[in-house]
Amino acid sequence: MTNIRKTHPLLKIVNDSLVDLPVPSSVSSWWNFGSLLAACLAVQILTGLFLAMHYTSDTATAFNSVTHICRDVNYGWILRYLHANGASMFFICLYIHVGRGLYYGSYMYSETWNIGILLLFAVMATAFMGYVLPWGQMSFWGATVITNLLSAIPYIGTDLVQWIWGGFSVDKATLTRFFAFHFLLPFIIAALVVVHLLFLHETGSSNPTGIPSDPDMVPFHPYHTIKDILGILMMLTALSMLVLFSPDLLGDPDNYIPANPLNTPPHIKPEWYFLFAYAILRSIPNKLGGVLALVLSILILAVIPLLHTSKQRSMMFRPLSQCMFWLLVADLLTLTWIGGQPVEHPYIIIGQMASILYFTIILLLMPLASMMENHLLKW
């Protein structure tokens, strides 16, 4: 008799995605981050749901409601810090996941890659709106500065900003709508994840060698289920240590001061995971130019499949391209550091050089390195 998981209409979908799915036998631990992201999303939705039960999205009470969650609600403090630091874990996994896609040429599956870029934008939007909700100083001023960037759009900019604010400044209407969108977006992200997986399972997973692996596959269960569970346990251990030992390590102390429109913090900066984009934004002295560079710093991922000039898919056997990739990683770390520094010499010039280098590596140096490798291999 055929097993029910192979015949039942619903279980069959789960079976084809998580049990009998053929996976290349050579995939390494870098392929674990997809499942880690799913675990992060689950943690964020669960903790967020319980936080939303006690949070009030009103400028008069938002800050106090977060304080109330931490002080008076049973295990409220752990929910709040799991949610805040869970976002950091989410972005660590997200950036590694994108990096793995770049390194091993996973972007050649263009539909999966493009849905992934859409997911990246959605997660960034969700994280930004979530940062506004505690209504501390950095929440208020971060919201003011970042939404104000839209005023750089010619002709409709000012009207667009006031439409988003729901008034002439960031106020009650802004906070209420940000809470509504922050609650809604994770479910849209979950739906996009299903589409992402749908496209992935159309082609099958890539592998470190970058060559077709049809003759050499293993079933997803038990090999990769065990591997994924180990990865999830390691990530949850790291998250627990962060939450229990230094919950405010990645936060900003200014956010423990209630929002005050009359008092500007000395250094307005976003959470650490946006600092690289913030540094690119600040490195251009023109407002519209900065906004364009900010958007393009992420949107540039969409042109990477078009810039693939190598005859090989993966970077595993391409030392020149590997050098370019790790130079890009170092450059992004430099930008992250610069984004957290004040706007003064020498940080300004370092930021400008790192920003130019970021676009140069992706648009020029990586395709050139690939062409050189083709030539060296006489292809």
UniProtKB/Swiss-Prot annotation:
Binding-site residues for heme b b562, renumbered to this chain: 83, 182
What the entry lists under Gene3D superfamilies is as follows:
Cytochrome Bc1 Complex, Chain C
Q: Which CDD domains match?
A: cytochrome_b_C, Cytochrome_b_N
Pfam families hit by this protein: Cytochrom_B_C, Cytochrome_B
Instruction: Tell me the residue numbers annotated for binding heme b b566.
Output: 97, 196
What InterPro entries does this protein's entry cite?
Cyt_b/b6_C, Cyt_b/b6_C_sf, Cyt_b/b6_N, Cytb/b6-like_sf, Cytochrome_b, Cytochrome_b_C_euk/bac, Cytochrome_b_N_euk/bac, Di-haem_cyt_TM
What PROSITE patterns is this protein classified in? CYTB_CTER, CYTB_NTER
Cofactor list: heme b
The protein's location, in the record's own words, is:
Mitochondrion inner membrane
Recorded GO cellular component terms are: mitochondrial inner membrane; respiratory chain complex III
Record's bilayer topology term: Multi-pass membrane protein
Instruction: Give the record's keywords alphabetically.
Output: Electron transport, Heme, Iron, Membrane, Metal-binding, Mitochondrion, Mitochondrion inner membrane, Respiratory chain, Transmembrane, Transmembrane helix, Transport, Ubiquinone
Describe how the cofactor binds.
Answer: Binds 2 heme b groups non-covalently.
SUPFAM superfamilies reported in the protein's UniProt record: a domain/subunit of cytochrome bc1 complex (Ubiquinol-cytochrome c reductase), Transmembrane di-heme cytochromes
Recorded GO molecular functions are: metal ion binding; ubiquinol-cytochrome-c reductase activity
**Which residues take part in binding a ubiquinone?**
201
Give a GO biological-process term. Answer: mitochondrial electron transport, ubiquinol to cytochrome c
Superkingdom: Eukaryota
Transmembrane feature ranges: 33-53, 77-98, 113-133, 178-198, 226-246, 288-308, 320-340, 347-367
Miscellaneous note of the record: Heme 1 (or BL or b562) is low-potential and absorbs at about 562 nm, and heme 2 (or BH or b566) is high-potential and absorbs at about 566 nm.
Instruction: Tell me, in a sentence or two, what this protein's role is.
Output: Component of the ubiquinol-cytochrome c reductase complex (complex III or cytochrome b-c1 complex) that is part of the mitochondrial respiratory chain. The b-c1 complex mediates electron transfer from ubiquinol to cytochrome c. Contributes to the generation of a proton gradient across the mitochondrial membrane that is then used for ATP synthesis.
What family does the database annotate? Belongs to the cytochrome b family.
Complexes and interactors:
The cytochrome bc1 complex contains 11 subunits: 3 respiratory subunits (MT-CYB, CYC1 and UQCRFS1), 2 core proteins (UQCRC1 and UQCRC2) and 6 low-molecular weight proteins (UQCRH/QCR6, UQCRB/QCR7, UQCRQ/QCR8, UQCR10/QCR9, UQCR11/QCR10 and a cleavage product of UQCRFS1). This cytochrome bc1 complex then forms a dimer.
Q: What is this protein called?
A: Cytochrome b
> What is the gene called?
MT-CYB
